[in-house]
């Protein structure tokens, strides 16, 4: 199914650290799913930049990573999508601080920083200051990489008027959390007119792994949020790591440095907890994917959600003023304490899982094909069975005809027939010596003793002229070629095996059996050659006696007897004896050679057998992997019975199984499919099974399934599936209509799915409703427009000109609009009935316009943070502050939480004292009017 895209502006996705990398990975793999061809992807003005202090998510040695493969394609990060900031070690930076002027500004005390950070391994090790130092040392490289990503976008869009840069980071570690502030600043510095959106993941309260917290997990999160708030409020200007002095890039136009912060966790507002390693990156990726490609910003129906994620119409409420602040005596303005350009997001997808269904069918059929590869055992109503068939392999394959074809008969082993193609064709031994005896018989008669003369002539041929060099010389010379002959025999056998396997006539398991039987037969041949040699020696001796006896009889004849028929008969008989004699004598030499050759052939066939077994193992591994893939594509959620997950599948796996069964039991189609898959997997030239096992990887086989077999499956589906049996190309509304039979079912579905969706952060109602000094009137919670707003977009596909389906969609829309609770946030809900996503109904939620202090877990973070910085040991506290904060010790930042009445009174008194002592007014900051 082709994916329609509403992406018309440039989008750059920047992933910082492991969390950012996981989101970019999920996004890129989704790109390959939705836009499966390079041509489609190349039309999207979207570029990625992954920044990390480790390359563990990158391909190694140019090899594709298995976990980045999507339908036979490699979605791994390319080199121009990755910036490794561990190229320079932190310890080296601190030891040579003068060589890093841009870094020097963020290191007040080299010794203290070096002592606090200590030694690092492959990454920043949950030390934010180390993460910032690494980024700062590579900040110019970051800007260059960002500009390169921008160029890639411009090359596609041809339009530089609108660019959005999305920055992703987790706040608990060292790399992403430590570099996020500089990444925002340098991005704004390089692209002053870009829309910059920051996505920051909070620490999980319940860790997926017990070893994730190295003592600073939550403290890092609080420190990072503190810095982000101060940066966005214009209350903190950190050092510019690509220039001198403070980085003053706060913009009153956007009310921040970035346009806004998206903060999220692994628990949504309704208490749904998802895995932060596997599910959460996909949720964020899915939200961003919908925002970039599926939400048409120019369509009025999407206006509310667009305004929500772009923080529009909230300039009057973007900032929270310091409740302990007092008017500046000159300007009368009150300092800003906090930003409210903060949101959180959520997406729930109710979908017909077409890709999963296609993969399940593909891998199920692929598994059946692999059974053919392995066993070639067809069973009616089952297809290719996962078990071998019974057969008399010795009788069927290890027979005289095949041995001759494989050059394992005596004629070939003795070289009576040639083995190497480059050798000449020679006469059979008996024919050769018979011709010699006949051809030289007349010449020999001229001698006094023609019998001896003929014997001498043939003996000379034996010694010097047989095959141009004499028998013993010939075979002695050929011994050097025994390895080549053994390999030629093996190749002949192996090539024949391969062709039969390739044609689908025989399985790899059967080849293994035949191979072992052949080795057993060659062992028997070696024994038979020994016995044949003994028999030939006896034959040779008997012929020699006959030859000698005939010579003596001829010698005993008188002159007249020799001249008449008696002598002629003796001479003719002697020719026969000499033919047999030299044939036997040649065979004896040839048999000795054959024994040596057979020994070498035995070894070669042993190697062949090992190679066939290796290839068989590769098929077994492929079967195991395919079984895993089939299992991975099985339905993992309960569909409408359990709607807690971010993705809810509505499908009929029984219909899918029926289609699979029909196809894999098709006796005509399955052998054709197996042959097509073999042609796709196999190299053009066969060398041997060992090379085949080495050259064909499991990925090659699964790629053939993803690329070739999936297309075959789709074609067969379109040919075979009746309208009510289709499992591909279905409308989600059709599936829902089959499940939601009554109006009550529809209402219950809408209510339940909405109650279990929502943004991935929980807010504290007390903090939301808190009334603060200097934020009265229109800025107070009594004005619902000032805080905690929510926009919801429900996207429903068109009903395919089906009146019944349209009526169902009408009821569904009404149910959704009546299902949202307006009591906790100012909520707008829009239903888009023109979604081009035929297989999906989605709910996108954006909750926005609240201060970070309103996030429910912040109180717990604050307690852990303060305990970490107040151990009672001043040196430890100072070192801990260096580890947590990217610059300074945090005291320069405004308070994330509202101050107490006592603190406000103390601040007012301190302010009066300060004003009395002040000689110069403070530099201007963002202030309330």
Please identify what each model-predicted range represents:
Residues 166:
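Short acidic, glycine-rich surface-loop motifs adjacent to enzyme active sites
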Residues 170-177:
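Short, glycine-rich nucleotide/cofactor-binding loops
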Residues 2-15, 19-32, 36-163, 171, ...:
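Terminal, contiguous helix-loop blocks that mediate binding/assembly
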């Amino acid at each position: 199914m082709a994916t329609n895209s509403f992406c018309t502006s440039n989008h750059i996705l920047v992933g910082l650290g492991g969390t950012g990398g996981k989101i970019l990975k999920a996004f890129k793999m989704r790109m390959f799913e939705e836009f499966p061809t390079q041509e489609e992807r190349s039309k999207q003005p979207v570029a990625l930049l992954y920044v990390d202090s480790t390359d563990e998510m990158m391909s190694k040695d140019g090899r594709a990573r298995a976990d980045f493969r999507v339908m036979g394609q490699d979605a791994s990060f390319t080199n121009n999508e990755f910036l490794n900031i561990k190229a320079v070690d932190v310890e080296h930076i601190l030891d040579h601080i003068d060589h890093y002027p841009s870094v020097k500004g963020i290191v007040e005390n080299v010794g203290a920083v070096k002592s606090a950070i200590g030694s690092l391994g492959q990454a920043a090790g949950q030390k934010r200051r180390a993460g910032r130092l690494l980024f700062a040392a590579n900040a110019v490289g970051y800007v260059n990489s960002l500009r390169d990503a921008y160029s890639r976008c411009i090359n596609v869009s041809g339009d530089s008027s609108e660019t959005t840069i999305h920055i992703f980071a987790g706040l608990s570690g060292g790399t992403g959390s430590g570099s996020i502030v500089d990444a925002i600043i340098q991005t704004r510095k390089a692209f002053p007119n870009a829309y910059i959106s920051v996505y920051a993941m909070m620490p999980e309260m319940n860790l997926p792994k017990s070893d994730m917290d190295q003592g600073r997990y939550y403290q890092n999160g609080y420190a990072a949020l503190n810095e982000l708030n101060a940066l966005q409020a214009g209350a903190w200007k950190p050092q510019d790591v690509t220039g001198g002095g403070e980085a003053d890039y706060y913009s009153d136009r956007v009310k921040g440095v970035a346009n806004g912060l998206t903060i999220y966790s692994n628990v949504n507002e309704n208490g749904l907890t998802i895995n932060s390693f596997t599910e959460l990156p996909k949720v964020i990726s899915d939200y961003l994917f919908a925002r970039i490609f599926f939400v048409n910003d120019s369509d009025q129906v999407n206006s509310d959600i667009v305004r929500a994620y772009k923080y529009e119409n909230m300039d009057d409420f973007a900032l929270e003023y310091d409740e302990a602040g007092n008017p500046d005596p000159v300007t009368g303005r009150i300092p800003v304490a906090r930003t409210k350009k903060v949101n959180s997001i959520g997406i729930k997808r109710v979908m017909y899982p077409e890709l999963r269904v296609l993969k399940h069918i593909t891998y199920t059929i692929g598994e059946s094909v692999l059974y053919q590869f392995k066993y070639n055992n067809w069973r009616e109503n089952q297809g290719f069975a996962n078990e071998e068939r019974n057969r008399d392999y010795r009788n069927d394959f290890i027979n005289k005809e095949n041995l001759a074809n494989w050059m394992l008969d005596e004629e070939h082993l003795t070289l009576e027939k040639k083995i190497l193609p480059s050798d000449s064709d020679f006469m059979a031994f008996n024919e050769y010596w018979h011709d010699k005896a006949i051809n030289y018989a007349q010449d020999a008669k001229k001698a006094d003793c023609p019998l001896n003369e003929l014997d001498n002539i043939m003996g000379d041929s034996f010694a010097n002229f047989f095959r141009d060099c004499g028998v013993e010389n010939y075979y002695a010379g050929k011994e050097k070629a025994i390895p080549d002959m053994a390999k030629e025999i093996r190749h002949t056998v192996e090539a024949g095996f391969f062709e039969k396997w390739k044609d689908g006539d025989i399985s790899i398991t059967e080849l293994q059996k035949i191979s072992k039987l052949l080795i057993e037969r060659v062992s028997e041949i070696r024994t038979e050659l020994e016995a044949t040699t003994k028999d030939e020696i006896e034959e040779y001796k008997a012929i020699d006696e006959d030859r000698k006896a005939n010579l003596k009889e001829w010698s005993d004849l008188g002159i007249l007897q020799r001249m008449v028929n008696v002598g002629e008969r003796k001479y003719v008989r002697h020719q026969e004896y000499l033919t047999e004699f030299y044939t036997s004598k040649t065979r004896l030499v040839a048999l000795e050679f054959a024994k040596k050759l057979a020994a070498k052939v035995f070894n070669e066939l042993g190697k062949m057998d090992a190679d066939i077994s290796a290839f068989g193992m590769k098929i077994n591994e492929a079967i195991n992997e395919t079984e895993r893939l089939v299992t991975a594509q099985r339905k993992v959620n309960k569909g409408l019975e359990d709607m807690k997950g971010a993705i809810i599948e509505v499908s009929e796996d029984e219909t899918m199984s029926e289609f699979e069964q029909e196809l894999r039991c098709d006796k005509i189609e399955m052998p054709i499919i197996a042959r097509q898959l073999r042609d796709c997997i196999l190299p053009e030239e066969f060398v041997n099974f060992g090379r085949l096992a080495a050259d064909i990887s499991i990925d090659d086989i699964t790629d053939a399934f993803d690329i070739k077999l999936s297309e075959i499956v789709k074609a067969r589906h379109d040919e075979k599936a009746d309208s009510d049996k289709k499992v591909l190309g279905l409308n989600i509304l059709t599936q829902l209509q089959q499940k939601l039979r009554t109006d009550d079912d529809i209402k219950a579905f809408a209510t339940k799915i909405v109650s279990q969706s929502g943004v991935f952060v929980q807010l504290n109602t007390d903090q939301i409703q808190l009334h603060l000094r200097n934020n009265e009137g229109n800025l107070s919670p009594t004005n619902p427009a000032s805080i905690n707003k929510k926009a919801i977009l429900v996207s429903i596909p068109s009903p395919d000109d089906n009146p019944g389906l349209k009526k169902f969609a009408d009821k569904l829309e009404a149910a959704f609009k009546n299902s949202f609770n307006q009591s906790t946030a100012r909520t707008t809900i829009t239903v888009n009935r023109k979604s081009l996503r035929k297989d999906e109904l989605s709910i996108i939620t954006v909750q926005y316009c609240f201060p970070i202090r309103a996030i429910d877990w912040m109180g717990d973070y604050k307690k852990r943070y303060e305990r970490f910085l107040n151990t009672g040991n001043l040196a430890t506290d100072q070192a801990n502050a260096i580890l947590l904060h990217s610059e300074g010790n945090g005291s320069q930042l405004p308070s994330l939480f509202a101050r107490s009445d006592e603190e406000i009174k103390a601040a007012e008194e301190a302010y009066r004292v300060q004003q009395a002592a002040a000689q110069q007014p403070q530099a201007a900051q963002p202030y309330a009017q």
